[in-house]
């Protein structure tokens, strides 16, 4: 469930404030499960809607969904396996290059295939998160020069998802209203 609060989408708010769920791990897992449900709903969009930019000079829904999958893959393969190993985290790919490559691929790929690949990768992420021991959720990561706990890192990724979900939802709402 998504709640709009002063224009900001907050699904972790729903779990904590409305349902009384305090565990940030449950909030993260809930977020990812809800995000999969949302992505599935995009399968019914007409192709022209899928490929139309959400705003002038912005990405299309295809490009937005398409760029999320390689980042999930990165977290599954280049972040989570290094928890508790003491090894340095691998460098992140160049964000602009990865985003542009994935956006191009999404523009030229089948809509259902893009969505299903995203869902498969997000499901891998969920399964990987479920395997993390309780004590590791507060472990400090050092991506680059900053330090951040795993839970804060994952909450940041969820906020990134929600930013894009909001863009897509608002674009669809405006178009449905004829704006």
What is the predicted role of each segment?
Residues 30-34, 41, 99-138:
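Acidic/histidine-rich alpha-helical segments that form the ligand environment
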Residues 20-22, 99-113, 143-152:
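Acidic/His metal-coordination segments adjacent to aromatic residues that form catalytic metal sites
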Residues 2-16, 51-97, 139-179:
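Short, contiguous alpha-helical
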Residues 27-30, 56-57, 68, 72, ...:
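Alpha-helix N-cap/loop-to-helix boundary motif
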Residues 24, 28-32, 80, 111-118, ...:
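Hydrophobic packing residues in well-ordered alpha-helices of helical domains and bundles
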Residues 2-33, 37:
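Extreme N-terminal tail/first-helix region
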Residues 35-43, 73-80, 119-133, 162-165, ...:
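Structural signal for well-ordered, non-membrane alpha-helices
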Residues 30-49, 54-56:
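Long, hydrophobic N-terminal alpha-helical segment
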